């Protein structure tokens, strides 16, 4: 059996394809979705989206929060923004992580601290997406 996966942002369609499985970051933790999953509507947290294609190859994307609806083997993810793991430059992601860590250490005031923590979280998620090693079949 297959799942129809749609990942949409206000700017573009990130994904529109049949897949075997996904692993999604939600506000209550990560969930795995296989065919015939129980219907669910859930908030999507910032984090990785793991996609298992029909040929058993795994891909990764990064979601920057949103909403997901899973029903009748169809997954619709409406995201605020998203990136495919293959679009992330590892060197750029590492540099962004280093900058975020430096900015956090010199943050002053509540606003600066919150912004620095958010930037650090985003940078770590991007690094995780780039460095993720898929499970062996």
From Swiss-Prot:
It is a peripheral membrane protein. It is found in: Plastid, Chloroplast thylakoid membrane. Pfam families: ATP-synt_DE (PF00401), ATP-synt_DE_N (PF02823). The keyword Hydrolase does not apply. One of its GO terms (biological process) is proton motive force-driven ATP synthesis. It comes from the Eukaryota. GO terms for cellular component: chloroplast thylakoid membrane; proton-transporting ATP synthase complex. The keyword 4Fe-4S does not apply. Keywords: ATP synthesis, CF(1), Chloroplast, Hydrogen ion transport, Ion transport, Membrane, Plastid, Thylakoid, Transport. SUPFAM superfamilies: Epsilon subunit of F1F0-ATP synthase C-terminal domain (SSF46604), Epsilon subunit of F1F0-ATP synthase N-terminal domain (SSF51344). One of its GO terms (molecular function) is proton-transporting ATP synthase activity, rotational mechanism. Produces ATP from ADP in the presence of a proton gradient across the membrane. HAMAP family: ATP_synth_epsil_bac. F-type ATPases have 2 components, CF(1) - the catalytic core - and CF(0) - the membrane proton channel. CF(1) has five subunits: alpha(3), beta(3), gamma(1), delta(1), epsilon(1). CF(0) has three main subunits: a, b and c. Belongs to the ATPase epsilon chain family. This is ATP synthase epsilon chain, chloroplastic.
């Amino acid at each position: 059996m297959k799942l129809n996966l749609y990942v949409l942002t206000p700017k573009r369609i990130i994904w529109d394809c049949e897949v075997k499985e996904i692993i999604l970051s939600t506000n209550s933790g990560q969930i795995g979705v296989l065919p015939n999953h129980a219907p669910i509507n859930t908030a999507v947290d910032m984090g990785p989206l793991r996609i298992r294609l029909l040929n058993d190859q795994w891909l990764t994307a990064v979601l920057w929060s949103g909403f997901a609806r899973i029903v009748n083997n169809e997954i619709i993810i409406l995201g605020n923004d998203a990136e495919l793991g293959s679009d992330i430059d590892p060197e750029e992601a590492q540099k962004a992580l280093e900058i975020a860590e430096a900015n956090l250490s010199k943050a002053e005031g509540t606003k600066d601290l919150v912004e620095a923590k958010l930037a650090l979280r985003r940078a770590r998620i991007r690094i995780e997406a780039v460095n993720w090693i898929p499970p062996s079949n």
